[in-house]
Amino acid sequence: MNIGIIIGRIGGVDGVALETEKWIDVLKAMGHRIYTLSGQFQERPMDPATETLVPEMSFFSPESFWSQKKAFFYPETNPQDLIEHLNLYSKVIYKKIMLWIGERKIDLLISENASALPSHLEMGMAINKAVNKTGIPTITHDHDFAWERGDRYLSPHKDINDFVEEVFPLRSPNSVHAVINSHAADTLKERFGRSSVNVPNVMDFNQVFGVQNEKNAQLPTHMGFSKDNLFLFQITRIVRRKGIESAIRLVHELDDKKVKLIITGNYADDAGSAYYNELVNLIHELKLGEQVSFAYDLFHNKGLSNGNGEIRFSLSDAYAQATACTYFSTYEGFGNAFVEAVLARRPIFVNNYKPVYQPDIGSKGFRTVMIENGELTKENVKQMAEIIYNPGLAKEIADFNFELGKKYFSYDTLREKLEELISMATSAA
């Protein structure tokens, strides 16, 4: 089967891009031919044999930037210009999607969050129109919904709110939904009467990941630290919902100069760098400048060089050097970094991010130290310290979690879910 994937950006480290890459791996292993249509191929070249670029589909295109600004951030009194803009550029994208479907002879479409979250209005409109026009079987991989983001996608214009309600999420009769947590499945059913398949984030538990080697043994030196330090790794982007301030406060509470916190992600998605500046101020206030490191310039998703000969480390390298991982998020659609830590056999300290963590992950029986509402208690810190300073206990916990992860969040699980979704989509069309 020729399967076409539509996505705003692919190749980076955000959850949508990472999970899409895994879907592609499994779908190819199932014998399907995969073609990708994207607005941006991030941190890697595009393969013209199977991949097609549509610049207007990028979240950072002038067209999308302008419409997001006028719809949600700096709306004008009269939305007519915005509506005309949306109609015009959605038609541009629609025509390119239709051409691509014909040229690649697409049998089934997968819309990667583009039909769920209105972060690119024109792309969502174009996909909606193409799916309805062609009647092609479609899977919408819904990572986030507008109502999960507070008032981020609430406009003062009724016309825009009505439009968002109509287009997102896509609800064509020839489409089926894949959601990433049980809360989303319940909400989709309650709001729209739409059933869905709950597909968790997964990892390939047969790959070598998070293993120490000659290259990543150099990592402490490249960060300016000693090899006998104890490293807590925060392997996420720097955005407010990641709760990184709790990890910084943990370092303060442990009160040990040998404990270092390494934050691997950048703050490119932090609007105005406001959250990043708050973290810097907190580090200064707690006098942790020698213990907390923003090391995003050292890391690339796959450890690729930046082109000038400097060493770049992969996320696997980061996990390999971690004593433990911090993951104090206040909200996640699922939790990619959690599964990565499990795969890397590293203990993890987590915030009970509601409404997802406990029902979809914690209830499986993983051994973690869990805090509530981002607040560290003396008991929490004591439990974390026991793991940090006891390598035997850390290994016991990590090995236990690895076996659970292999059972619930492996490529085998994803393959079963994709077989179900493809069957549902082809039956619905």
In which residue ranges do the predicted regions lie?
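N-terminal subdomain of nucleotide-sugar transferases
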Residues: 1-55, 136, 415, 429
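A conserved catalytic-core segment of Leloir-type glycosyltransferases
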Residues: 35-108, 300
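A short, active-site helix/loop in glycosyltransferases that binds the activated sugar's phosphate group
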Residues: 149, 155-214, 278
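Aromatic "clamp/platform" in nucleotide-sugar-dependent glycosyltransferases that forms part
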Residues: 330
